[in-house]
Amino acid sequence: MIYGALGDIEEYRGMLKGLDVLIDWLEENDPAELEVGSHPILGDKAYANVMAPTTRPEAEAHYETHQRYHDLQIDVEGREAFKVATGSLTLVQEFDEKDDYDLVDSDASIAGDLADDKFALFVAGEPHMPTLEFPGDGAQPVKKICFKLLADAYWEE
């Protein structure tokens, strides 16, 4: 996971091809202007999924993992918490190749949030649990963007 202030994202240029594409896009575009839905940035190599969910308690969620895509997530309205699994994993739902995800539970984690213009980049294969209730807020609406960035290993397919 890479976690920091969205305004500092340029520091991560050169790490991942898809991240470089997104950094270039962010220099020219305001993500808050995107409507709910899917928006291509560079075909299926980089795109934005804009969602308007309600945050949920951890007890109602599982960790998700992806094989082909990294997820870079931001909140443009509201705020959410997230967790990243650090312990042993228990499979909850088999991998769905079409939608590139499986669900797992874990016995240990670290936590963060996407308040105050922060971002989190969850790398492919990293179990993460987004869209959790921000501490003390309860369930709240949030407008968020999950930028899907194709992992370098699949870039030339």
Regions found by a protein language model. Name each.
Residues 113-133:
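Conserved metal-binding segment of the jelly-roll/cupin
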Residues 79-83, 127, 153-154:
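Short beta-strand segments in beta-sandwich/barrel cores
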Residues 42-43, 59-71, 88-93, 107, ...:
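A short beta-loop-beta micro-motif enriched in histidine and acidic residues
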Residues 119-121, 138-155:
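A short hydrophobic beta-strand segment most commonly corresponding to one strand
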Residues 1-50, 60-62:
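A short, N-terminal "cap"/entry segment at the start of jelly-roll beta-barrel domains
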Residues 36-57, 68-76, 84:
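A short glycine-rich, His/Asp/Glu-containing loop-to-beta-strand
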Residues 67-80, 86-88, 94-104, 148:
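Short, conserved beta-strand element in jelly-roll/cupin
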Residues 70-74, 111-112, 119-120:
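His/acidic/aromatic-lined binding-pocket segments of jelly-roll/cupin-type domains
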